Amino acid sequence: MDVDSASDDVSEAVQVLRRVFGYDAFRGSQQEIIEHVIGGGDAVVLMPTGGGKSLCYQIPSLVRSGVGVVISPLIALMQDQVDALRALGVRAGFLNSTQDLEERRLVEAEFLSGELDLLYLAPERLRVEQTLNLLDRGKISLFAIDEAHCVAQWGHDFRPDYLALSMLHERWPDVPRIALTATATDATHTEITSRLRMPDARHFVASFDRPNIQYRIAAKNEPKRQLLELLRSEHAGDAGIVYCLSRASVEKTAQFLVQNGIDALPYHAGLDARTRAENQSRFLREDGMVVVATIAFGMGIDKPDVRFVAHLDLPKSVEGYYQETGRAGRDGQPSTAWLAYGLQDVVQQRKMIDGSEGDDAHRRRLSSHLDAMLALCETVQCRRVRLLAYFGQQSGPCGNCDTCLAPPQTWDGTVPAQKLLSTIVRLQRERGQKFGAGQIADILMGKKTAKVIQFDHDSLSVFGIGEDLREAEWRGVVRQLLAQGLLAVEGDYGTLVLTEASAEVLRGGREVPMRREPEKAPRAAKAKSRRAAPVDLPEEALPVFESLRAWRGRTAKEQGVPAYVIFHDATLREIATARPSSTAELGTVTGVGENKLAKYGPQILDVLAGREPDGGATDGTASDPASAGSAAGSASAPAASASASGSASTSAPGRSSARAGRPGTGASGAGAFGAGAFGAGALEEPPEEEGVPPEPEDDIDW
């Protein structure tokens, strides 16, 4: 490696942390990971969303000689990260199908001439000999494999092209690799290591705990009404994501919210590419927008002020649930993860598993994922304890989730379980019939419905033996028996059948403890909205904070980027509290790197002094969107020019001065990778490229 010594590299990494990214110290294991990769070692990194994974490859790319090549699964993710890096003065570019031939050639030329610090590629590009030959001709500092869980063949985000990434070490054996993901069980972790052929990699596993997120799971009654109550009472005016299982549910829910005064937009793969891009852009740029989406939405979205993530349908796995809820509260502020869950969710998921492709082993694997999700829903433990245990980590009760705030009562459900299981047995043995939960509950409660009379079920000996429980309670019994593996669902109609474990309950050899739903679901300790003062902001600083937010909003609109690409709320809060009176003092604020200090420092000082700031960015950077987000280098470096090709470079030869660096205190990296402006090409159908396999649509309803 072209460096003087390991200590020099470490020193330079700290300088990069501060000068480029505006942080004073690394967080958690960031420094250890960065030092290891700078030294040429392979690494597998498991770190939660908002934990600063991106810094772990961005800083080594700026310190090591050559260009860091980042393998990213989504085109939108590449665009977002590149745009935000340009704003920091990092020379970043990408190659994907949104570019025409001339644009691609420009980026390729910059790569070969060493005018890039980072190059983003989709994994599909590495199946193309032309791309491989390009990489052979350049100097590569490292390979970063982002969203590495996509290599897990039976995972929730599997991408087949990730399987081919094992060839990186074969073709470039001396180039270090770092694989990163925000969610992985021990099994997925092992699969990542094996499939990417990284046997000698060091493994870094951070805590998956997200203490600022409150986890709440409610019994599904009228889910859209329940959601509306949550938004009105606790998240008025907040940005959030609502996940639904189907496209039809997405459309209906978005329409319902709009009709009730909520700014909501749909997002699913059934919408055309332009509409999806426009809706995503509005979510990123406008305050208080709610996106209602299938799980196709969210990977790579770095909007820090998402205050809630709601699920109106049961997620397929705990891993998927964790990843989706992790999109809330990236800024560290209190946020809500809310899920409405009902019996029909289980029926639907079982039906999907039965009809899924793959062998019996695959279906058993999907069933085990669903069973773990059901167990999380029905637990009487702290949600956080149960969630972290799934990932092999230990934690004490959080005191903040619904089960901690309103501990559910438990009761002995053995007798009701025996009654329900006996009813199923009698229907099968005496009548040769199978029915779903609704009919079983009607029989138990002694309800002479038309269907009960039609099948003569009122003559069964078990008819009416469960009159002591209401229908909702019987549905709760069914849900919990399913979660405990004492009951199963089969077929298109969701009929209930016994399992091997059911016999022990019927014989009286096993007790069945159950949770009783609280009369009223617990709320957050204090309702939050974007209009409320942030929890860590002194009251006297609030007017200054709002003035800074207003300036940031105007500046972002002028430049055509999301507000948090200018500065995150956390940085504005620190500025409002510290009230710096000079650019030197402003430069010590977390999140204010040299490039942003040069561009925005005088304007911020004007706002703090109560003066009207001059329009546009300073230090020679134009205020129009074409050039605003693209300045490269330090305050003394020439302004950069951003091209539609997906790269930004300075006029100075060789490495950008960003490599001299600048990163630190709580270096989550969130401030570095906000989603940036969407290039015009991202809104259009990409041209066919000869010899290049199509990149998968970002928005598949998995």
Whereabouts are the PLM-identified features?
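Helix-turn-helix/winged-helix DNA-binding modules
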Residues: 25, 301, 379, 431-432, ...
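Short, charged low-complexity linear segments at domain edges
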Residues: 362-391
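Accessory DNA-binding and partner-docking regions appended to nucleic-acid-acting proteins
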Residues: 1-13, 366-367, 394-702
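Eukaryotic partner-binding/assembly regions in large regulatory complexes
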Residues: 311-313, 377, 416, 476
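Helicase motor core with emphasis on the C-terminal RecA-like subdomain
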Residues: 2-20, 24-28, 32-44, 48-54, ...
